[in-house]
Regions:
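Extended alpha-helical regions
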Residues: 103-114, 144, 156-158, 164
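Extracytoplasmic/secreted cell-surface and envelope-processing proteins
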Residues: 29, 145-146
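Short aromatic-cysteine micro-motif
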Residues: 1-129
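Disulfide-stabilized, aromatic/cysteine-rich ligand-recognition loop
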Residues: 2-5, 9, 17, 21, ...
Length: 262
């Protein structure tokens, strides 16, 4: 239950050179996958073998998103990350999956967690970019100009502008107003991955789910989905329901260190 403003404080207390992973950097990672694997469905079964032409096939598997038993994630560890720290270190900076087995656990007389085998994944060294827990992205805010309009997307990768203001950010487009599976991204001239049109399924078009809310408050973006989200999760799973600095037990952030080129 940490708000984004407190996330900023905590990460600076840990290391002043660190920051929350921002939308623009996350977007670049997503496009790296989309181009390398030539699909938008990162939950396709993992296949380590290349095609005869030397291309990747499949995706990164289900990740941790099959921990879908009702209330199991909460009972297991109160919505904290499931993968032990360093569990995927042997994959290095490559892409791959590794089984993680959770045994049957009797919580009390009224609740038992059923045994399940999950497949946490890495993409080019980044662990569990989807599933596990919702990622709160820095440098992006959504807000309607009035009650009858859709959310305008305000974004920046300038870390001096990482705050809750919209006046110091670029307008990148308009977010879809409906909930559902994503058909079309905003794209624009900076390859935005915010949903523009809904109307797909979990196995067609962008394959990931979009949740939004109809009010005029400033919204933050939670992405990737959580461990209980099943097919709704994925790189482009976008949730813009929450007001800026809302707290959630099943959301967190990725940290990064920015290096200036020499």
């Amino acid at each position: 239950n940490v708000s984004r403003i407190n996330m900023r404080t905590f990460i600076k207390n840990a290391n002043n050179n660190q920051e929350i992973l921002c939308y623009d950097f996350y977007k670049a990672l997503c496009w790296c996958y989309y181009v390398e694997y030539a699909n938008f469905n990162c939950q396709l079964p993992f296949n380590a073998e290349l095609t005869s032409d030397g291309y990747h096939q499949g995706g990164l598997g289900n990740g941790l998103t099959t921990f879908t038993q009702t209330n199991a994630w909460e009972k297991f560890n109160n919505y904290t990350p499931i993968t032990p720290c360093g569990y995927l270190n042997d994959i290095g900076n490559f892409s791959g999956v590794k089984e993680l087995s959770i045994p049957t656990i009797v919580i009390d007389d009224s609740y038992t967690i059923n045994a399940v085998t999950l497949t946490p994944c890495k993409y080019r060294g980044f662990e569990n970019l989807f599933g596990d827990y919702y990622k709160n992205l820095e440098g992006i805010i959504l807000q309607k100009p009035d009650a009858n309009s859709a959310n305008t997307i305000y974004a920046t990768s300038d870390n001096t502008k990482f705050n809750n203001e919209i006046s110091n950010k670029e307008i990148r487009g308009i977010e879809a107003t409906d909930n559902g599976y994503i058909k079309i991204f905003v794209f624009g001239d900076k390859a935005e991955i915010v949903p523009a049109i809904i109307g797909a399924t979990s196995i067609t078009y962008k394959s990931d789910y979009h949740n939004t809310k109809n009010d005029i408050n400033k919204k933050e973006i939670l992405t990737g989905g959580g461990s209980a989200n099943g097919n709704n999760a994925g790189f482009s799973n976008f949730n813009s329901i929450d007001n800026v600095d809302t707290t959630h037990s099943n959301s967190g952030f990725f940290s990064c260190v920015r290096y200036n080129s020499i």
